[in-house]
């Protein structure tokens, strides 16, 4: 196989979203799988909408996701510059080539690309004026995912607007030629443009790259393509919420690609080894935030203890004036560590930590009224609380198993179940019915804080 060169060409006109990240990922994976080159090219010709801030978001997001580019802004390369706003001389040079070949003309102040073929006039859809059509053979697109696609391109099209700026179709093709791109991997929504691009490649006498139009990512609920405005669409949001980039990359790789079996969680090295264009599906992929959350949870579970605690602390630091965050960061490091490790098996993301751990860092927490009514309305909860408080001095708080054994002994003694004591104990120490294991909560909080909290519930 000839050396593969792929490119990712985003526009810095908005925040970096899931669809763009998945397109970048498939290009990056294919380059890494084949030992090729991943080129980052910035399509920043829209002067009114471009933003350096959004450009930096693109750079930061790609790096956060681990998709370092081989050529492009900040890296250089023999085919630069890599920002379209800096390539006007290149576009003028290629325009001159087309003009010299008789393939352009001016109309209404714009420059048009002239298709080859017999011309004829037809009325437009309103039958008010005529439109020039061109008799051409269908343009054949050999797509690595869609197969053979034929489209009829029967109208000339603008390549330079009346304001003197080149249009997307022209700069896209010129840059792919100049940068020797061998494979164009992009969203299916670009398939309708591809016949124009093929005709331009042919007009320049350049080899047509291999095309691979990947499936769209659909909204989680309802029809249509996922857009920047949809919840969960922005990469920056996952960074802010404390998701692991490895989990997001793994999840994105499976949005439209199949490794050939039913595996879902895979290290990036394995994804690179397996990734190839024949494994990309034709059918669109539907975004599923619950699946992503479970994927993230699986990655969190695998983090070494020190790494998890370090990342948890960094997340709390990112919350600024959040009351729980301030209390957590002010706690003794050893206590903070114990609370975090107790929570690690239970959370799907770091964003859950403040609500999940708040009662560890303050004794002044609210009690969930619905949970209270449910727990305190079953049997004789006050009696169970008194029995539990009286038994605490005999509990070994040194480890979870010892605490569990103490509660079991108490339950057996009073002909009750472990859950009968667990429910009132959890309500007393946390004010809710969800959280880490009750035995772990007892161990981390310690005998005196547990006693004080249970007595507060008893006397409420």
UniProtKB/Swiss-Prot annotation:
Domain of life: Bacteria
GO biological process: glutamyl-tRNA aminoacylation
Positions bound to ATP: 228
Top-level EC class as recorded in UniProt: ligase
Cellular component aspect of the GO annotation: cytosol
Pfam families hit by this protein: Anticodon_2, tRNA-synt_1c
Motif ('HIGH' region): 10-20
Catalytic activity: tRNA(Glu) + L-glutamate + ATP = L-glutamyl-tRNA(Glu) + AMP + diphosphate
InterPro entries xrefs: aa-tRNA-synth_I_cd-bd (IPR045462), aa-tRNA-synth_I_codon-bd_sub2 (IPR020751), aa_tRNA-synth_I_cd-bd_sf (IPR008925), Glu-tRNA-ligase_bac/mito (IPR004527), Glu/Gln-tRNA-synth (IPR000924), Glu/Gln-tRNA-synth_Ib_cat-dom (IPR020058), GluQ/Sye (IPR049940), GluRS_core (IPR033910)
Subunit and interaction comment: Monomer.
Sequence similarity: Belongs to the class-I aminoacyl-tRNA synthetase family. Glutamate--tRNA ligase type 1 subfamily.
Protein name, as recorded: Glutamate--tRNA ligase
Source organism (scientific name): Opitutus terrae (strain DSM 11246 / JCM 15787 / PB90-1)
Name of the coding gene: gltX
